[in-house]
Curated annotation (Swiss-Prot), chain A:
Gene: FDP
Organism annotation: Arabidopsis thaliana
Family annotation (Pfam families): bZIP_1
Protein role: Transcription factor required for the transition to flowering promoted by FT.
Protein name: bZIP transcription factor 27
SMART domains with a match to the protein in the record: BRLZ
Keyword check for Transport: no
Curated annotation (Swiss-Prot), chain B:
Pfam family membership, one: PBP
Function: Controls inflorescence meristem identity and is required for maintenance of an indeterminate inflorescence. Prevents the expression of 'APETALA1' and 'LEAFY'. Also plays a role in the regulation of the time of flowering in the long-day flowering pathway. May form complexes with phosphorylated ligands by interfering with kinases and their effectors.
Protein encoded by which gene: TFL1
Name this protein carries in UniProt: Protein TERMINAL FLOWER 1
UniProt organism field: Arabidopsis thaliana
Annotated disulfide bonds: none
Record-linked InterPro entries: PEBP (IPR008914), PEBP-like_sf (IPR036610), PEBP_euk (IPR035810), Phosphatidylethanolamine-bd_CS (IPR001858)
Single GO MF annotation: transcription coregulator activity
Family: Belongs to the phosphatidylethanolamine-binding protein family.
Biological process per Gene Ontology, one example term: cell differentiation
């Protein structure tokens, strides 16, 4: 119980701290999966909240290998250091990521420096990796298109239609909402009219009733006098 | 009839019956539409099952020498968000003498029960005062794509003298109210 709580804390911490690094994120979540189900779910929540959808899919591919390689507590050290070892924008292939982790263990390097020193052109590196991403996981390419430079031509079309559809749906929804409001307003107006109508009718009927009462009272009086006169003979 | 100001058609304006189907008009005749003694009021919801047989339509106005035409349409076919078949014609009765009801008129298009499939539909009853008694045989190849405005122009009916609408949706639809 205690240890699981500890794992929980660690994983949460890592999920927060490494949100910029994609590959390490996926590693962290798969680790969580190994350790405890609850932690896993929490990590997922964090990932989903960050709308980093495609890491999940990446992750599935890496999972078995990581399971085999790092089944123990020892990796938690590496794991915590990982975010600092990884260059944030280019997610390196899974094998290299684990190697790096193993090599640099507890020697954190600032990520931007790594990027600059290892690659002369950051942009190209980025493009390459994202294309790898595309190749390995076609479903993720729409998300990766958000990062710019790559796959514009291929991404454009489906992205546009998707945006278009969303826009249309939004417009439709607004129209529907407006109709709903109008319906409600019409209904309310009608009820108000009915109330006004009933009120005037009620007032009219009340007056009529009063008049009838008075008429009845005077008639009764007349009747009474008549009755008395008719019963007079005795 | 005394308190028939412009307020009376407010619900028709809010419900966009005036606009979608009719032009602005001043109601001058009282019309009562009721299904099984339940009076139809603007914007109220009725269930398709409760409107399956034709309603009683009373005209409290004019006299026996004046004649009225009643039209019932659905401007939300097939669905209110894209009513590309509008308007759908449900009923036409002509030559209804004033102070009577629709059964005294001539039914030229039989009553078709409302069967809204997509969304919430409006069903509108429109009453016109005829200039004279006349027999019309409207040329209606299909109940879809009917146009009340055009119909009024074609038969020289002028502006409506009364209108009322109710809402209806599928019997099984999820209702929030």
């Amino acid at each position: 119980m205690l240890s699981s709580a500890k794992h929980n804390k660690i994983n949460n911490h890592s999920a927060f701290s490494i949100s910029s690094s994609s590959s390490s994120l996926s590693t962290s979540s798969s680790l969580g999966h190994n350790k405890s189900q609850v932690t896993m779910e929490e990590v997922w929540k964090e990932i989903n909240l960050g709308s980093l959808h495609y890491h999940r899919q990446l992750n599935i591919g890496h999972e078995p290998m990581l399971k085999n390689q790092n089944p123990n507590n020892s990796i938690f050290q590496d794991f915590l250091n990982m975010p600092l070892n990884q260059p944030p924008p280019p997610p390196p292939p899974p094998s290299s990521s684990t190697i790096v982790t193993a090599l640099y263990g507890s020697l954190p390097l600032p990520p931007p420096a790594t990027v600059l020193s290892l690659n002369s052109g950051v942009g190209f590196e980025f493009l390459d990796t994202t294309e790898n991403l595309l190749a390995s996981n076609p479903r993720s390419f729409e998300e990766s298109a958000k990062f710019g430079c790559l796959g514009k031509k291929r991404g454009q079309d489906s992205d546009d239609t998707r945006g278009d559809r969303r826009y249309k749906r939004m417009i439709k929804n607004r129209e529907s909402a407006a109709r709903s409001r109008a319906r409600k307003q019409a209904y309310t107006n009608e009820l108000e009219l009915e109330i006004a109508h009933l009120q005037t009718e009620n007032a009219r009927l009340k007056i009529q009733q009063e008049q009838l009462k008075i008429a009845e009272a005077t008639q009764n009086q007349v009747k009474k006098t008549l009755q008395r006169s008719s019963t007079a003979p005795f | 009839m005394e308190n028939m100001g412009t307020r009376v058609i407010e619900p028709l304006i809010m419900g966009r019956v005036v606009g979608d189907v009719l032009d602005f008009f001043t109601p001058t005749t009282k019309m009562n539409v009721s299904y099984n003694k339940k009076q139809v009021s603007n914007g109220h919801e009725l269930f398709p099952s409760s409107v399956s047989s034709k309603p009683r339509v009373e005209i409290h106005g004019g006299d026996l020498r004046s004649f009225f035409t009643l039209v019932m349409i659905d401007p939300d076919v097939p669905g209110p968000s894209d009513p590309f078949l509008k308007e759908h014609l449900h009923w036409i009765v002509t030559n209804i003498p004033g102070t009577t009801d629709a059964t005294f008129g001539k039914e030229v298009v039989s009553y078709e029960l409302p069967r809204p499939s997509i969304g919430i539909h409006r069903f509108v009853f429109v009453l016109f005062r005829q200039k004279q008694r006349r027999v019309i045989f409207p040329n209606i190849p299909s109940r879809d794509h009917f146009n009340t405005r055009k119909f009024a122009v074609e038969y020289d009916l002028g502006l409506p003298v009364a209108a009322v609408f109710f809402n209806a949706q599928r019997e099984t639809a999820a209702r929030k109210r």
